[in-house]
Swiss-Prot record:
This is DNA mismatch repair protein MutS. GO terms for biological process: mismatch repair. GO terms for cellular component: cytosol. Residues 794-816 are annotated as: Disordered. ATP binds at residues 613-620. It comes from the Bacteria. GO terms for molecular function: ATP binding; ATP-dependent DNA damage sensor activity; damaged DNA binding; mismatched DNA binding. Belongs to the DNA mismatch repair MutS family. The keyword Disulfide bond does not apply. HAMAP family: MutS. SUPFAM superfamilies: DNA repair protein MutS, domain I (SSF55271), DNA repair protein MutS, domain II (SSF53150), DNA repair protein MutS, domain III (SSF48334), P-loop containing nucleoside triphosphate hydrolases (SSF52540). It comes from Pseudomonas entomophila (strain L48).
Amino acid sequence: MSDLSAHTPMMQQYWKLKHQHPDQLMFYRMGDFYEIFYEDAKKAAKLLDITLTARGQSAGQSIPMCGIPFHSLEGYLAKLVKLGESVVICEQIGDPATSKGPVERQVVRIITPGTISDEALLDERRDNLIAALLGDERLFGLAVLDITSGNFTVQEIKGWENLLAELERINPVELLIPDDWPQGLPAEKRPGARRRAPWDFDRDTARKSLCQQFATQDLKGFGCDKLTLAIGAAGCLLGYAKETQRTALPHLRSLRHERMDDTVILDAASRRNLELDINLAGGRDNTLQSVIDRCQTAMASRLLTRWLNRPLRDLKVLKARQDSIRCLLDGYRFEKLQPQLKEIGDIERILARIGLRNARPRDLARLRDALGALPELQNAMAELEAPHLARLAAITGTYPELAGLLERAIIDNPPAVIRDGGVLKTGYDSELDELLAMSENAGQFLIDLEAREKARTGLANLKVGYNRVHGYYIELPTKQAEQAPGDYIRRQTLKGAERFITPELKAFEDKALSAKSRALAREKMLYDALLETLIGHLAPLQDSAAALAELDVLSNLAERALNLDLNCPSFVDEPCLRIEQGRHPVVEQVLTTPFVANDLGLDNSTRMLIITGPNMGGKSTYMRQTALIVLMAHIGSFVPAARCELSLVDRIFTRIGSSDDLAGGRSTFMVEMSETANILHNATDCSLVLMDEVGRGTSTFDGLSLAWAAAERLAQLRAYTLFATHYFELTVLPESEPLVANVHLNATEHNERIVFLHHVLPGPASQSYGLAVAQLAGVPAVVIQRAREHLGRLETTSLPHETPIASKSKGEPDVPHQSDLFASLPHPAIEKLGKLDLDDMTPRQAIETLYQLKNLL
């Protein structure tokens, strides 16, 4: 479309604007509709399921188009944003009555998934984050912005692995990366990844724009002055936010420097397996958050989600939260606070919309109600003696002047938008009241005029009325129109009627319509001025909102502690993880029978538990509940256990369950091995590691060998490890690894049917119960019977060269009777395996040796 002269004036105007936003859908305001043209129309018609048509011609071709009513915009925007689309809103800013040629239009806002602020487009209980990334293979700068709250963070991260784990944690809906990065990098595979010009990330420009935004000389006060990569990313984010919002951003007041060392790190697999806030099916039911979130406000739910996804290693913060929960439980004080907190609502996002100058009348009404509830809440907070709660109370103000202003200004139940007025109270502004009175008295004038004209003309069917297109009129039936007086001027002909206007009615119309339009303009001006007044108080209001959100989360955790029977964990310096009567917080809520609680003990004498037992016996539940108890402790929450004593952990790893990564071309076994490799490379003696059925995705010998070697390596790393397996050969590990112990989930058989007891007991399992589980799953009886025959034969098979793998220590429970898989290996492989010095082998040498062993089979 380089030659615009061939187009009509309207399309020339359209293309000048469209060329500035080639990759976004443009909604072009024409009267009461937003019209969409050309390729945008084809795409929008398909996505929105609306009719695609054509509008005249331009440059010799018909124009594909579709449209939506202007008052239905929000619903269509919501659908497009959920589909990941961005939309440019182009409004008429000129006056059609005075315009020569097309009415002047401008882009007034750009809607993207990461920069939306409209309540209708947002999930109220989820952060809506946009991130920007700058760096190379070794070091990355990451900036994250929530435009709906003003939260703005930066950090620098070493390596792709840590970066991808962090991106999984924050889960941004948009991710901005430099356009000069190579194609196909891991970050670009995330949904919402968008390339931006390299100069958008310029570090010097970024530093200047950030200092200007925060009105500071430098960034030292934010602790990020030397994070040049993160500053470049933050500058890109700030520029993108200003570009889309087309206004100042006064609610963005500071940068917060986050450090991965301050947090318990969970990789993508661990977050998925633990189902913190999203279950394995992609929903929210039966997640940890679904059980522990009874927050009164949406802003508190979002904060709790952030806590769950960013557990802390800061003992000072964790103990302050624990003390706060104890205080709120004392005398059930949380019960008094929660109804008052509910009155506060989501003022965090309301304040952001005020800062963006797009707050709606109902936002201000909700803020008015929230400010009105603050004095009573402040009185209740004054009774809380816990130091952290006292700090929150000190931050939370009452703002009587603002509360009074909003009470005087906004009617009790305002309309959704300011567009048609009717928002401000009578008495708030005398000039507005006068204009409205002039407009509203029109009704009585028309009644009086109709009565006078009927008397003057003798025409009983005469009516006086008004419509938005033709204004005021006097209507007569067609048969009586010829009897109209001479001062009646014909205005409109209808089927069966004629409409007229008189000089008197015309004079009144000019006065009334002028008063109405002037009243609307006055009300909009006053509304904008009200927003500016609130913007002047934005900083303390935002601080209060943050404090109230945290108070809500802590009150919620106190309520959950009482009603879910949670107890306060103790953090100790001694390396340990001891749990008495631990429970799975989610599973126990969905069971119809009592949950079987279990103990766990890991310390300097025992760092790994080999867990055996039948399928469905509870091994995975036992492991997951341990991880969730540790995680809940690291957000400052009480935990589902009678007693819990632990030291700080640095990471939580899970290798539980796998599926094919078809898009990535990886098999189930490859996914499993990738997760295992990540654990073996990154686990430390402060890590919690859950390993479930490692090695099951390949041949028996390969799988057992890999599981054995992985377990030995984790024992040597001294990581807190729960290692569930069906390879009973691994139960001899305690004989060679002093930090390893056996436990099992017990079960019993009755009348050839299995009964799961779910108790964790010392020692290895006595048998696998695999056939009983298969029978429970509905495997045909004839197959079960045949399997029993095969099992009996296999269990009695004895080969001449069978030898024990390791001698049994005195007092050690008998290893369960099961065919020894290693016993059938040819002698050369056994001999080679016995000569290996595993401590001196590199990972590469270990893999090569495994291949050599396999070739000897």
